[in-house]
Amino acid sequence: MKLALSEISTVNSTFAEDVAAYAAAGFDAIGIWEFKLPDDDEANLALLRQHGLTVANCVPTVPTILQLGIPGMEGPADPEIRIEGLCASMRRLAAYDPESVLCLTGPLAGRTPDDGRAIVIDGLRRAAAAAREVDVTLALEPAHRTQRETTSFVNSIEDALALLHDAGLDEVGLLLDVYHLWDDPALWDLIARASYRIAGVHFADWPTEAGRTDRVLPGEGVGRTKEVVDALALSGWDGSLDVEIFSEPDRFWAHPVDEAARRALAAVSALVV
């Protein structure tokens, strides 16, 4: 497995600063957030080559089909605009040769489950077609059940696989976010029996302190992260472990990019033995 760091973990730095710091820390790959990319893709690719980084997975500028309920990340309200943006991101991000490009459903936000599901299935089919045209793997990310009203109405591995089955999209993978799925009973069976469906891994831990909504480095919480790494290794899965830390301003996000990258590498390296 390769080791990667997702750019949201160093939200206050630029793409160029991320690339330099992640490479200097010893990461193999970067998890790109499209909103951080400068417009010149050729220059961006040259910078990645210069520093020897590959791309783990990409998060599109508009990552959900239905509008997010996270303050500051809502984006357009119209699902049609969101789907068109998601398809455009597939075409742009293909140049970076990522392991996958992810999407989430978004929350229902007052829609009936049937109405929301119909919109999402249409969006997934169109995004998958756009991904197929440029040889990109689309990955659907479930979110933890506590984020049903803000992030996604797909809150388990079973939900995600059922949605993809209903959409007729068996080629679409799953983005396994350990923070979201560490307590899903189906996690271990997915890794052991169907690791080929895992198109990417986001890696963070669930804090030990009750009431916290941020994430901590792998190995610092209660999320059985070492067991996940061992299970992935046993299954033969060989993608990137992409450390992804959503933080509070005075916690992990307060670190300078170089220090954040070093801390993240030390944490994930300790689990990959």
Task: Map each language-model feature to its residues.
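Conserved beta-strand positions in the central sheet of alpha/beta enzyme cores
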Residues: 31, 57-59, 102, 139, ...
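A short acidic, helix-capping loop that chelates divalent metal ions and anchors anionic groups
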Residues: 64-74, 109-113, 145-150, 209-215, ...
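Active-site-proximal loop/turn and secondary-structure-junction residues that shape catalytic pockets
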Residues: 9, 34-36, 61-64, 105-109, ...
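Histidine-acidic metal/acid-base catalytic patches
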Residues: 1-26, 88-91, 97-99, 159-172, ...
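Short catalytic-loop micro-motif centered on adjacent basic/acidic residues
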Residues: 5, 29-34, 175-177
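N-terminal substrate-binding region of glycoside hydrolase catalytic domains
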Residues: 21, 25-39, 59, 64
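Active-site acidic/histidine proton-transfer and metal-coordination neighborhood
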Residues: 74-173, 183
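Glycine-rich, proline-tolerant flexible connector loops at the mouths of alpha/beta enzymes
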Residues: 31-51, 105, 111-112, 148
